[in-house]
């Protein structure tokens, strides 16, 4: 393969990297100008008009870079290999690269209005570098490249979580996320090393062929379990979810939105490839009448624990961001249902659900960002009377909460419907009925705390001190447009779910 062909196949990632470098350069130059102005005036540097303009230029370059990256993905061939198969191009990888880049696009839009960020150029550059990690993850079918993508993504997310130096909770969130993320990486790397030692390969297809011909040995089983534990940390599945509440609450809101959405999409895509392609021969069975050892029972237990713990603990939350964090734990359990089913339909349902969930979470965090800028907090009481202050935001938040609860005709309902249908058909003789029952129980419980949020928005009286100035409304305009766009996407995908579901099903086949 010539260098020109290699550049064409790697164009989406290259465009995002170049955009990150340009954004970083603009941000650094604007800081230098501000620092020189501060020294010459013998006063601390303030956010001057040039700094505001530089922030706008950084956002514009980031948005244009992501848009060009999407166009570059659309121009990729249907199937291709890079670096000897370490990276692959398939309809599935191309589709989810677009989804990940689109989520990064909306995160940049939310970050544009985040006034607490003192260095927006560096922040946007880190978002772009994290997006490169997402694209490498989605496009990889080789364990070594998967680990590289995980580390590039993880290092970026740790910095994003701790980026607000004026807030001690942000530092706490970054530290906890770093400690748990490092533990996750250690488990994943140790598991990969054991799998490589027992199979002699890091390619998923080769590993599958090897596992189909040799008996399962204790070291190999240990490697599989440790790899699954590492990914359980990444998707915040119980009991490996302890980092999520503090990270979601303490991190800057765009960071929390990105961690909750894009990183989970890529993690579920990769986890599905690993268990269904690489570990396929070790599937086992999670049926209540025919339990067989394998990775499927492990994921089934993680799913059940996540659904029960996430939903029950969410009932006690009074902070909306912590509520969304424990809700994310429960939704990780729902999403694992499709992988436990193990079929093509199950994997497709998992991918559809995680995409819908990611869109919904970015929108919900967008509403939280506007409310926080108006009231200074993100507790339930800060959402009181939102319907009177901003009917648009209240309506959008209602769409997001009801979609998360799985209420028709919103997209979240069809996501759960596809997951439950795939699980019901798997295993023979309704073997996964017990897990579906747990998921239905969790869905009923979750409806209560989602309605609590809507009660605060539409029923409770607003605080006397809550008011929005015209300047504040103008500064939050981009966030409001972003939230409205995401709410419209949830409505559209609820009315026409096959628009996305059929594409995913065709890409998986």
Task: Identify the residue ranges that each predicted region occupies.
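Alpha-helical transmembrane segments of multi-pass membrane proteins predominantly involved
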Residues: 1-509
């Amino acid at each position: 393969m010539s260098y020109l062909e290699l550049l064409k196949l790697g164009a989406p990632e290259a465009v995002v990297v170049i955009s990150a470098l340009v954004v970083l350069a603009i941000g650094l130059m604007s800081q230098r100008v501000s620092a020189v102005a501060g020294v010459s005036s013998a006063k601390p540097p303030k956010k001057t008009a040039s700094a505001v303009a530089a922030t706008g230029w950084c956002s514009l370059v980031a948005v244009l870079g992501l848009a060009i990256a999407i166009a570059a993905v659309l121009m990729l061939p249907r199937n291709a290999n890079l670096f000897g198969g370490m990276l692959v191009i398939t309809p599935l990888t191309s589709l989810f690269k677009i989804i990940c880049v689109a989520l990064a696009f909306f995160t940049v839009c939310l970050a544009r209005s985040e006034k607490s960020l003192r260095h927006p150029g560096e922040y946007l550059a880190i978002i772009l570098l994290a997006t490169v990690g997402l694209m490498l993850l989605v496009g990889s079918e080789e364990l070594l490249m998967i680990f590289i993508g995980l580390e590039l993504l993880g290092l970026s997310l740790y910095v994003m979580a701790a980026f607000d130096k004026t807030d001690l909770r942000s530092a706490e969130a970054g530290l906890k996320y770093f400690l748990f993320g490092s533990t996750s990486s250690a488990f994943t790397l140790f598991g990969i090393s054991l799998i490589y030692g027992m199979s002699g390969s890091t390619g998923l297809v080769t590993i599958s062929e090897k596992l189909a011909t040799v008996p399962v040995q204790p070291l190999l089983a240990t490697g599989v379990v440790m790899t699954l534990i590492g990914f359980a940390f990444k998707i915040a599945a119980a009991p490996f979810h302890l980092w999520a509440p503090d990270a979601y609450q303490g991190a800057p809101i765009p960071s929390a939105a990105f961690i909750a959405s894009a990183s989970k999409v890529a993690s579920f895509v990769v986890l599905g490839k690993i268990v269904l392609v690489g570990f396929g021969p070790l599937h086992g069975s999670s049926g209540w009448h025919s339990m067989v050892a394998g990775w499927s029972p492990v994921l089934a237990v993680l799913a059940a624990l996540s659904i029960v713990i996430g939903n029950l603990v969410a009932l006690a939350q009074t902070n909306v961001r912590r509520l969304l964090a424990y809700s994310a734990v429960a939704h990780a359990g729902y999403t694992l249902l499709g992988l436990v089913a193990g079929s093509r339909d199950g994997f497709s349902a998992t991918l559809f659900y995680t995409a819908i969930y990611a869109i919904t979470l970015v929108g919900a965090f967008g509403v939280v960002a506007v409310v926080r800028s108006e009231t200074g907090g993100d507790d339930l009481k800060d959402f009181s009377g939102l319907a009177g202050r901003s009917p648009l935001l209240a309506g959008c938040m209602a769409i997001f909460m009801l979609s998360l609860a799985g209420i028709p005709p919103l997209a979240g309902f069809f996501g759960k419907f596809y997951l439950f249908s795939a699980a019901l058909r798997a295993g023979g003789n309704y073997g996964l009925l017990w897990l579906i029952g747990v998921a239905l129980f969790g869905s009923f419980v979750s409806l209560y705390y989602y309605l609590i949020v809507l009660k605060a928005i539409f029923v409770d009286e607003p605080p006397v001190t809550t008011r929005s100035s015209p300047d504040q409304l103008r500064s939050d305009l981009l966030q409001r447009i972003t939230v409205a766009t995401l709410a419209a996407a949830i409505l559209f995908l609820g009315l026409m779910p096959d628009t996305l579901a059929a594409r995913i099903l065709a890409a998986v086949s």
